[in-house]
């Protein structure tokens, strides 16, 4: 999005047309939705919300620089953000953390844009942080979307090898991978990729997960990626790197 802003600002368009394009970008951003189906205490959602708020601020700053200052309106809102978390305490923390992030960004807004004000109280509605099992709940019910809407799914699903799954987790894998041969050899995280692929199929939505490299090498490649690539295509990927996190698994 920052690249898109720079592209507009650096273009040969007249300032009023640049302003029009920037406002159109704000309107597009306001319709986006963001879902973390393994959100834990909300780290990824918090970062996404804060960065989107900063994009919004930058656009208003650019409008002012162009001599096309606009009355401040709220485009990025908490109700665009959704999460699923199986741990009750963590889901409560995620909800609270989003409200804290909202307050922090309201303070930052007041410092950057002197003419803008955005009250924290009363607390704003969050799209939904669901205390539920992401492999047992319909993601479409959590974060409803149409084919044209832009929904961005991201997160850090749990890492468990196929041999470490308990009885309940094995049953979840069986229910999700019906018709997929040798699913019992797949890591637990494969279920999030498969459900995510089904969610974004034939839509403008995107999905990106931090994942174990085991699903991208050895026997799991053919087992997992074949059914997924029948639904969607890969637009980008990163090579393996060391990842530190405080997740339980």
Where are each of the predicted segments found?
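Conserved SAM-binding loop
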Residues: 94
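Signature of N6-adenine DNA methyltransferases within the class I
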Residues: 46, 53, 91, 99, ...
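Conserved SAM-binding motif I beta-strand of class I
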Residues: 81-84
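Class I S-adenosyl-L-methionine
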Residues: 1-71, 76, 86, 90, ...
């Amino acid at each position: 999005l920052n690249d898109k802003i720079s592209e507009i600002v650096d273009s040969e368009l007249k300032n009023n047309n640049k302003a029009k394009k920037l406002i159109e970008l704000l309107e597009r951003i306001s319709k986006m939705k963001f879902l973390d189906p393994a959100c834990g205490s909300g780290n990824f959602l918090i970062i996404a919300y804060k960065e989107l708020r900063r994009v919004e601020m930058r656009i208003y700053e650019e409008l002012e620089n162009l001599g096309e200052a606009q009355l401040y309106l709220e485009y990025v809102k908490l109700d665009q953000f959704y999460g699923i978390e199986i741990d009750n305490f963590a889901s409560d923390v995620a909800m609270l953390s989003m409200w804290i992030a909202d307050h922090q960004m309201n303070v930052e807004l007041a410092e950057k844009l002197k003419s803008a004000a955005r009250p924290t109280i009363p607390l704003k509605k969050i799209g939904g942080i669901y205390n539920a099992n992401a492999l047992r709940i319909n993601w479409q019910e959590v974060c409803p979307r149409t084919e044209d809407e832009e929904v961005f799914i991201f997160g850090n699903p749990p890492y468990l090898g196929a041999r470490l799954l308990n009885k309940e987790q094995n049953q979840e894998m069986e229910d999700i991978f019906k018709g997929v041969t040798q699913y019992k050899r797949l890591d637990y995280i494969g279920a999030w990729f498969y459900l995510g692929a089904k969610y974004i199929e034939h839509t403008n939505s995107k999905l990106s997960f931090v994942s174990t490299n085991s699903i991208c090498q050895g026997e799991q490649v053919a087992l997992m990626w074949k059914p997924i690539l029948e639904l969607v295509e890969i637009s980008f990927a990163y090579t393996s790197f060391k990842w530190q996190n405080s997740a339980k698994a």
